[in-house]
């Protein structure tokens, strides 16, 4: 009777629970570093790439996959893949803060108040277009503009994210467009496109923030990978995490990088 998401992104109910078995198990590690333990008879819907770049699907057991990987040469056409699930199909809900504006604050906002620091005038225009007003520039005129977004501090506090930045579950379960707006606010303020890797990247110094972004991206049907990296600031080197992903023609920016020629995944 519990509700879960199916591979199409729709909510469905659990109709049956299998018995407990004591079968041989395999640990499967995916190319993004995540692992899962499954018994040898578990059936997987596997995709193989064709020469024309389309995919064919077959059902294989865990044991079948293990034998396949041992016996077959490693080519792009012989590596079994589990295709991404579709974006979560959820209704639009009322949110206390516009998701794009919240994304901007999570990306470039002061954790203790409603101030956002940004150099791009189009970001400010987009925030204003969404019905928000802000104060004058608080910077020294030599750096990015710092402006207070009015009437969001209390809402940030009510969401429990003031002085504690994270993506609230309420936003993780909003509609597709609302979740995409949230991602675009984050990317417009704190993301970039890596030209040589042909990947979209957002970096953070907090691992749990990287995991938050990974969750958000996955709800949009996009596969992302987290890399631990060394970051440098003011001559000091410290640990950080980059969340990297590609898309099938979807630009995760809204007002920035509209002219980049990125390949589909």
Predicted regions mapped to residue ranges:
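Intein-associated homing endonuclease modules of the LAGLIDADG/DOD-type, together
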Residues: 1-10, 15-236, 242
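Polar, glycine-rich mid-to-C-terminal structural blocks
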Residues: 234-265
